[in-house]
Amino acid sequence: MAASKRLVVSCLFLVLLFAQANSQGLKVGFYSKTCPQLEGIVKKVVFDAMNKAPTLGAPLLRMFFHDCFVRGCDGSVLLDKPNNQGEKSAVPNLSLRGFGIIDDSKAALEKVCPGIVSCSDILALVARDAMVALEGPSWEVETGRRDGRVSNINEVNLPSPFDNITKLISDFRSKGLNEKDLVILSGGHTIGMGHCPLLTNRLYNFTGKGDSDPSLDSEYAAKLRKKCKPTDTTTALEMDPGSFKTFDLSYFTLVAKRRGLFQSDAALLDNSKTRAYVLQQIRTHGSMFFNDFGVSMVKMGRTGVLTGKAGEIRKTCRSAN
């Protein structure tokens, strides 16, 4: 079933991406002549790593999301900066893992295509291949990005697990993404984990009166309180209990039952458009979810890209040239 879904997605993307020129200079197969081995090399690195640690899928997906939402998809989240002043040192990025996969991919590519492939393109490919490794969606990745030189901890302003629907829609629109993209990309939480500190107020003091969030199913809230005590700072919770290692539709089913882990998950029911998209995924048994996810990932991957002579091609992904 997963293989057939990926085939359908790939066919739809060939029609979509080749029929519409990308004015930003990105295209599928940008390196077809200069580094034809690119995708095979990256895929092998990702699959080898995820065979050993399948839970890396969610952090790698988040890494691409976090990169694109700050300064655009320019690989700035990968940079190490003096005194921990780069993006990766910001609180929302402290839980990112898998930087070694980017490093290993870059090192392997430098052996066969030195100075050709950008780190920002590697990250885009890694995010896709991580989903495929989990039998999730596949899509044609547009390449041609160049790497940014700036990474500033003070510029990290990402959508938050505490955000309401108005803030979420505003943040996504600022990146050229609409309500459907918000819902579909939130579906990536099907493989996610959350930590107790992000739930403390929602479970124990939502309005400052020792109460829980009324938008959270009471039975589910009781289960969460057993796992997350008020002072718990370390326990990790599955965002899609029982299915967090599989990229599937169950996230939307949970949200519709008021069992989304974060306030931002519950918020998807607070707007007529986003609620309709959630219910549509359930009603159609997610028949278009894999395809829609790929479409939204391609759209996000066009955010603020550097192309042409802008930026650079880094020699290593952790430092500018």
From Swiss-Prot:
CDD domains: secretory_peroxidase. Glycans are attached at N164, N205. Its EC number is 1.11.1.7. One of its GO terms (molecular function) is lactoperoxidase activity. It catalyses: 2 a phenolic donor + H2O2 = 2 a phenolic radical donor + 2 H2O. Coiled coil: none annotated. It is found in: Secreted. Substrate binds at P159. Transmembrane segments: none annotated. It comes from the Eukaryota. Heme b binds at H189. Expressed in the whole plant, but preferentially in roots and flowers. Ca(2+) 1 binds at D67, V70, G72, D74, S76. The record marks R62 as: Transition state stabilizer. Belongs to the peroxidase family. Classical plant (class III) peroxidase subfamily. Removal of H(2)O(2), oxidation of toxic reductants, biosynthesis and degradation of lignin, suberization, auxin catabolism, response to environmental stresses such as wounding, pathogen attack and oxidative stress. These functions might be dependent on each isozyme/isoform in each plant tissue. This is Peroxidase 27. It comes from Arabidopsis thaliana (Mouse-ear cress).
